């Protein structure tokens, strides 16, 4: 018995034909299927083809994740290991939009792990945060919260 196919179209017009079970790992898409809105291609305005391909890869691997939880710990770690930070941020946005909770949590943890040993200035640079403290204000904060800067 073959599975029903769902077509997803990215914001840059890449089409992906995937099994319904894989598509249902994306809760937003699952709701569209349940509401009979998936007869034709489902257009995902906020997700590029590059990002959608990565999400589909994750969903394909996790389609039967109830049976093999331990197997995924290693696979998930390898999955995010070589993805650059810019792509991780885009994946996080897309996983949030598509409601892929496991992927969203995985990426959030990967970003947290990456930033764990960074300095304040490195984190500002990573997240494009402007330092709006005067040197005097910053020095006062460093003294007041010395424990956080060691």
From Swiss-Prot:
Which UniProt keywords are listed? Nucleus, Ubl conjugation pathway
Primary localisation category? nucleus
InterPro entries from the xrefs? SKP1, SKP1-like, SKP1-like_dim_sf, SKP1/BTB/POZ_sf, Skp1_comp_dimer, Skp1_comp_POZ
Localization in the cell? Nucleus
Its UniProt miscellaneous note says:
This protein was called 'Meidos' in memory of one of the murdered sons of the mythological 'Medea', as MEIDOS is repressed by MEDEA.
Protein's job: Involved in ubiquitination and subsequent proteasomal degradation of target proteins. Together with CUL1, RBX1 and a F-box protein, it forms a SCF E3 ubiquitin ligase complex. The functional specificity of this complex depends on the type of F-box protein. In the SCF complex, it serves as an adapter that links the F-box protein to CUL1. Probably implicated in incompatibility response after hybridization.
UniProt lists the family membership as follows: Belongs to the SKP1 family.
Q: What is this protein called?
A: SKP1-like protein 17
Source species of the chain: Arabidopsis thaliana
Highest classification ranks of the organism: Eukaryota, Viridiplantae, Streptophyta, Embryophyta, Tracheophyta
């Amino acid at each position: 018995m073959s599975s029903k196919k769902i077509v997803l179209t990215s914001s840059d017009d890449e089409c992906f034909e995937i099994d319904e079970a894989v598509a249902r790992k994306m809760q937003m898409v699952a709701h569209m299927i349940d509401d009979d809105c998936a007869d034709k291609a489902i257009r995902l305005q906020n997700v590029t083809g590059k990002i959608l391909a990565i999400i589909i890869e994750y969903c394909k691997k996790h389609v039967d994740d109830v049976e093999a939880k331990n197997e995924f710990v290693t696979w998930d770690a390898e999955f995010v290991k070589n993805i650059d930070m810019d792509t991780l941020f885009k994946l996080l946005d897309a996983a949030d939009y598509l409601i892929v909770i496991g992927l969203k949590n995985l990426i959030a943890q990967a970003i947290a792990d990456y930033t764990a040993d960074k300095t304040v200035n490195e984190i500002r640079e990573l997240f494009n945060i402007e330092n709006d403290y005067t040197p005097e204000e910053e020095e006062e904060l460093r003294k007041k919260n010395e424990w956080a800067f060691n």
